[in-house]
């Protein structure tokens, strides 16, 4: 094995023992998340309750919809997303905005897994599990 390849493997093994979120790791996670469902970002559509409950509730009640429970509990993030979409964007961009928020939430969860303040075993495998879920 060549010296550069051995050095690369040593660095990879070191990272695997003590994983940290670097820009490269974040970019790889984002790419893998995108490849999981590319149609969600390339041809976005509203899904399930996004349009029929949260956007309609936003249209009917405005900001008061944030405090309306649905199916027994509050859906703060979907209702905040509906409020932001309705107040900031053209209706044609609402599905893309919903999917971008979902993408950002997934990336935030993956980034949190790699936090040094969070003691978890086998962080790379946990991240892989989240990506495959």
What do these predicted ranges mean?
Residues 52-53, 57-58, 67-91, 96:
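Short hydrophobic/aromatic helix or loop-helix immediately within or flanking a transmembrane segment
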Residues 26-30, 75-79, 83, 99, ...:
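Alpha-helical transmembrane spans of integral membrane proteins, capturing the lipid-embedded, hydrophobic core
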Residues 124-133:
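Membrane-embedded helix bundles of polyisoprenyl
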Residues 1-33:
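Start-transfer (signal-anchor) and selected internal transmembrane alpha helices
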Residues 100-124:
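Transmembrane-helix motifs of polytopic, lipid-linked glycan transferases
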Residues 20, 24, 43, 47, ...:
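Aromatic-acidic/polar surface patches that form glycan- and anion
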Residues 34-37, 83, 87, 117:
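Transmembrane helix-loop junctions and nearby membrane-interface residues
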């Amino acid at each position: 094995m060549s010296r550069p390849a051995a050095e690369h493997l040593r660095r990879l093994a070191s990272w695997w023992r003590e994983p940290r979120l670097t820009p490269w790791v974040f970019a790889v996670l984002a790419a893998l998340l995108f490849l999981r469902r590319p149609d969600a970002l390339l041809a976005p559509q509203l899904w399930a309750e996004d349009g029929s409950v949260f956007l309609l509730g936003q249209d009917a009640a405005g900001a008061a919809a944030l405090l309306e429970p649905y199916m027994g509990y509050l859906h703060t993030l979907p209702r905040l997303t509906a409020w932001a979409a309705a107040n900031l964007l053209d209706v044609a961009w609402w599905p893309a905005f919903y999917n971008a928020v979902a993408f950002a939430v997934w990336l935030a969860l993956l980034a949190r897994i790699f936090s040094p303040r969070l003691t978890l075993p086998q962080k790379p495998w946990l991240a892989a599990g989240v990506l495959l879920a």
